[in-house]
Swiss-Prot record:
Location of the ApaG domain: 1-125
Name of protein: Protein ApaG
Encoding gene per record: apaG
One Pfam family it belongs to: DUF525
GO BP: any one term: error-free translesion synthesis
NCBIfam families registered for this protein in UniProt: PRK05461.1 (NF003967)
Length: 125
């Protein structure tokens, strides 16, 4: 497996108050991921891995094929964007992980997704 600095990942998260029920320890977040291919060759996203940690340190691992039902091909200079969600039991938590990808020659590589916060805007820790 090769390491590729040619794919860039950015994530924005937002608290979904209308779907959350804090009294039931249910905090819903949406996150939008933008994956940019900065390289010269097309790439394809095959799978994902997430480590979701709530404010109490409880961890959940999620892995699977593709994202939002797709295994997108991303041409050089192009980007793929999708929105998904996470539900945790505390008003603050984190997510991190990686994407399993392959280039046009069939070389597999991972793209890390650095830690990002899931936080209710009014919550101060």
């Amino acid at each position: 497996m090769i390491d590729s600095p040619r794919v860039c990942v950015q994530v924005q998260s937002v608290y979904i108050e209308s779907q959350s029920t804090p009294d039931d320890e249910r905090f819903v977040f949406a996150y939008t991921v933008t994956i940019r291919n900065l390289g010269r060759m097309p790439v394809q996203l095959l799978g994902r891995y997430w480590l979701i940690t709530n404010g109490n340190g409880r961890e959940i691992e999620v892995q699977g094929e593709g994202v939002v039902g797709e295994q997108p091909h991303i041409a050089p200079g192009e980007e793929f964007q999708y929105t998904s969600g996470a539900v945790i039991e505390t008003p603050m938590g984190t997510m991190q992980g990686h994407y399993e990808m392959v280039d046009v020659d069939g070389n597999a590589f991972r793209v890390a997704v650095p830690v990002f916060r899931l936080a209710v805007p009014t919550f101060i820790h």
